């Protein structure tokens, strides 16, 4: 049985990843899903075998993931938190660091701490004109994800790039 880790398991992309894993691997997939928000004791991420609540940057959350398994066939990273709604050019180093704290920085940490065959991160198109005026510091986090995708590492890197398209 292969282990699959989904960070951001309650969001649209994370829940879609869980459904796709189930559809492709069925009961042979052991899905561990992380979520963070207002804690709801007893809450289970739909389709996951194990639900881990917590901020992925917290060492206790990492230990909870390791307590299930240290070896994963696949990790899907679909969580983000950062400043949007202002022009990208107005993002300060502090806002970028705050955005990266959850939106990018945990990815290489997870790669180094766990044995993961492939990591797929989720990005969006952030360089089209109408996004440049509203994507704020988050654009830098998405850029970091895309640059990381091209780097070699312990795991295979991939990125799903989705979003709005210019017509």
Predicted feature residues:
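Conserved mid-core segment of classical short-chain dehydrogenase/reductases
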Residues: 81-95
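Catalytic loop of short-chain dehydrogenase/reductase
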Residues: 95-100, 117-154, 163-167
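Rossmann-fold cofactor-recognition segment
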Residues: 44-60
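Conserved glycine-rich Rossmann-like NAD(P)H-binding loop of the short-chain dehydrogenase/reductase
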Residues: 25-43
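Conserved hydrophobic beta-strands of the Rossmann-like cofactor-binding core
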Residues: 3-6, 75-76
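Conserved NAD(P)H cofactor-binding loop of Rossmann-fold oxidoreductase domains
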Residues: 76-85, 123-124
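N-terminal Rossmann NAD(P)H-binding glycine-rich loop of SDR-like oxidoreductase domains
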Residues: 5-23
